[in-house]
């Protein structure tokens, strides 16, 4: 049995959950998300204690894999619609900067052109002091994916550390060539 899957999910007071067959719809103050549960997993709601429980309908390897996965995905959806998720990026380098143009993010990171990043409709980008970018949204996977796409534009280089990095990410710097 999955150690993660057998844990109950606590529901905050401001969350509404509707379960119709294998579809779970979660509504909260930040928005609304839905998820289709695989047939190998069954979900039950305890309205007295405000908890959700997930059970396996079969006892095979695939059901074991999906048990913990479904519980984690539903828990992340609940956190997303109640609190939201955010990732922070830092830009380091001489002349490297970012700015917002409407919803689009404009990056000047050492290329001959400005790189334009167009976020999906439910992702909010914020820029503070031209060198830090905050990505906010209700879907954890989507927030992380957009952050990874922005970082991939100019990843930190190993000699001086110039580039786009996650906040508090440590870069192992290499020692340059020694002179003769």
UniProtKB/Swiss-Prot annotation:
An example GO CC term for this entry is: cytosolic large ribosomal subunit
What biological processes does GO assign it?
Answer: cytoplasmic translation
Keywords assigned: Chloroplast, Plastid, Ribonucleoprotein, Ribosomal protein, RNA-binding, rRNA-binding
The annotated subunit structure for this chain is: Part of the 50S ribosomal subunit.
Q: Which family does it belong to?
A: Belongs to the universal ribosomal protein uL6 family.
Question: What function does the entry list?
Answer: Binds 23S rRNA.
PROSITE patterns per UniProt: RIBOSOMAL_L6_1
Sorted alphabetically, which InterPro entries does this protein's record hold?
Ribosomal_uL6-like (IPR000702), Ribosomal_uL6-like_a/b-dom_sf (IPR036789), Ribosomal_uL6_a/b-dom (IPR020040), Ribosomal_uL6_bac-type (IPR019906), Ribosomal_uL6_CS (IPR002358)
Against Gene3D superfamilies, the record matches this protein to: Ribosomal protein L6, alpha-beta domain
Coiled-coil stretches are none
Question: Sorted alphabetically, which HAMAP family does this protein's record hold?
Answer: Ribosomal_uL6_B
Give the organism, scientific name. Answer: Gracilaria tenuistipitata var. liui
Where does the record say this protein resides? Plastid, Chloroplast
Among the GO molecular function terms of this UniProt record, one is:
rRNA binding
Asked if the keyword rRNA-binding belongs to this entry, the reply reads: yes
Gene encoding this polypeptide?
rpl6
Q: Would you tell me the protein name for this molecule?
A: Large ribosomal subunit protein uL6c
Signal peptide as annotated in the record: none
